[in-house]
């Protein structure tokens, strides 16, 4: 029953044409890579949303008017007056423990793998975050043009022995240009 629910949720979250061959064929909350953020929110709203910068890009956090996810992190180039979306991360808070996040991730991973045989999959394993005992476990799927899908669970523990049962599931779509910028930032 849980598997059916996850598949239904994934299908509601994502629009996938039967011949999807690049990241622009996907939607999260009706938004795709290559769309203008201005099609969904006003410039005044963008200015009100929390944001930060990553290299040549700005990221804006949207937490209002969402149907499925708790928040969206939308990435676009700093000096782009059209606000063309290069990255899109959907976040779901998980309050029932990291193992439930891993179950959700596993189900979605199987669904992505069954939809696409031509993507290059990589499980990065459990990686450490900046805070002690906090980790994340990303799995990436790369298209031939280097666009990327990433799913990940973030375990936001308080200490080695104390979990706060507040974890995060992330589903990301990234253009190849944004993936390259992330790689450059990681080297620096």
Question: What is each residue range found by the language model?
Answer:
Residues 60-84:
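Compositionally biased P/S/T/G-rich terminal and signal peptide-adjacent segments
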Residues 21-65, 87-188:
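Non-cytosolic coordination micro-motifs
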Residues 4-18:
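Sec-dependent N-terminal signal peptides
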């Amino acid at each position: 029953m849980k598997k059916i629910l996850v598949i239904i949720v994934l299908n509601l979250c994502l629009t996938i044409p039967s011949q999807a061959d690049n990241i622009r064929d996907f939607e999260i909350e009706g938004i795709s890579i290559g769309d203008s953020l201005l099609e969904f929110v006003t410039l005044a709203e963008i200015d009100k949303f929390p944001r930060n910068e990553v290299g040549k890009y700005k990221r804006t956090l949207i937490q209002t008017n969402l149907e499925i996810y708790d928040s969206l992190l939308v990435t676009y180039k700093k000096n782009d007056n059209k606000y063309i979306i290069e990255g899109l991360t959907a976040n779901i808070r998980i309050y029932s423990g990291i193992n439930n996040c891993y179950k959700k991730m596993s189900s979605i991973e199987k669904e992505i793998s069954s939809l696409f045989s031509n993507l290059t999959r990589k499980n990065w394993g459990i990686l450490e975050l900046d805070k002690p005992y906090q980790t994340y476990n990303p799995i990436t799927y790369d298209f031939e043009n280097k666009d990327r899908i990433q799913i990940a669970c973030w375990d936001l523990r308080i200490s080695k022995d104390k979990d706060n049962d507040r974890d995060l599931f992330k589903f990301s779509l990234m253009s190849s240009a944004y993936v390259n910028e992330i790689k450059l930032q990681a080297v620096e």
